[in-house]
Amino acid sequence: MILETFGSRVSCLVSLSLSEVSNCLELCIVTANGYRVYFAFKIYVVIIWSGFLYAKEIETKNTFMDALTNNEKSYTANDGTAYRTSGSALVDLNFSVPALRQAAVDFYSKSKHNRYFYGEDCTMDAVDALRLFITSYEEDPLYTMKWLMYVRHIKLGLGERDVFRMMLTKIGNLYPEMVLQFIIGTELWNYGRWDDVLRIFFDTTSGILHDGLGKVIANQFRRDVIGCGLGDSISLLVKWMPSNNTSSKEKRSEAAILQSLLHLSAREYRKPLSKLREHLEVVDRKASLNQWNAINYNHVPSKANLKYRNAFLKHDEERRKAYLASLQKGDDAVKINASSMFLYDIVQAYLKVDSYWDSSLNPYDEILEQLWNAQEAPKDYDDILVIRDGSGSMYQQLTSNSSVTALSVADSIALYCAQHNKNKSFNNRFITFSNRPQMVDISMCQTLRDKLRRLHRFDDYSNTDIEATFDLILDTVVKNHLPQEALPSSCLIISDMQFDQATEHDDNITVIEKCRRKFETLGYTMPRLIFWNVSVYAHNTIPLQVHPSGIILVSGFSKSIVDMVVSRELDPERALKAELDAKCSIVDTVLQNYVKVA
């Protein structure tokens, strides 16, 4: 009877104070025999309830502090209100890829200049980058490691080499067994390169990780020596192993470490390297030996097609022209490798930079056109309106060791997406904006060069008025009395995210939120929004956290990101995790005994 009465009342206790709980329980046990039982039971409950209320208070305070942190505002370089975080460290990490790339450039001392559009203080340093990564790992270790695989994956992911190495080395110093399992289990060399393994082997401070990777390298080297002797295919390990007779002191030092690992003398190390590289038929080696006519153009890697395109014509003109002619005809026996490259590599190769604010186009280039045409079309890309930022700040360079600009990235993505849009209304059309939005139509352009020439006519390099763009979209449907269905289902905004402040500025509301209210006031729903960050400065200026129609936050330079753009998810974290599950699910199995599922 006592327990039944107590059970019927316990659900109401959560909202009561400690004294009220005590009185309530006194009623529950009034029929108990003896004061001793009553007293002991009451004291026990009071102690337990005190702990419960304290825990509840802490939980409430933590919830408040989390909400306060997530609601913290920041400001763009143009004084627009933004959010400092998306509310998820994993999403913040994924939205900061350009900044992470710059941090890695500094980390590995690869900077060639220190020209920053908004100043170096606005960029992310390596300490901040690693802190963000570790924060994400502590929140969700499994998905953070999936993200790391995605960051490196040359074909399915972002293709970021230095970011991956910096972060994997750091986490490897902290959790060496887990990282060793990650590298071996996911077969890093198949979605990255063998020099990733070598770099971490040389850089790690963990003896466990260093020794474990040493065994991996030594075993692969021995297998390749045997495979070469049998005439079989071998790995690309020797392509990236440093030579011991190079002019670089650092490389000679690293070669000495490998000699010791493999128990070889300097001569014994040099001889198999030369033989194995010859067996690989590496393009760079044949070029350095002036063996141009021995190069099979069908097997030339993506980047080498760009790097040597003029040299091929100069040193092997007849064969090269015949190869290009076969490509133009669509000869099935002839192919060009174009998968392992960034779209901006092709666009940038067409640009001739005359000054910081001025550039022109190089002459028509058949290789650039073929590389562009060979890019695989995205799947299910439909009903998405591209909005490309053409403001002055987009002329910022991606990193301090690159001449590529954020504008070249935006151009390449905008042209690629518009070209492959299955919706006839948006096919080969998109909006560019700066001081004012303009519609760009490239449907009459036959070549990539023609498209770039037309696009550059719309650049005005002034401010970043995204509000005017959505005003134009809204004004169009209102004036023409168009239904909601006439609007695109999604808008893809490719930008550095340094938006101007709203015309009616409010420190607590972002310009995008202002635009959404305008749509709602006039009876429309703002389309789903996809923000694609291409700038080193946007890591702490999140344009939006939630949106009724859905929001996706992406960054980076790979066309594989479009797979996430076409996602039907409405929440940025769910969209990212769905992408990671689709492309990096092997990590679930590889790390099942090494990390906890959040």
Give, region by region, the residue ranges found by the protein language model.
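Long lumenal/extracellular ectodomains of secretory and single-pass membrane proteins
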Residues: 55-409, 419-598
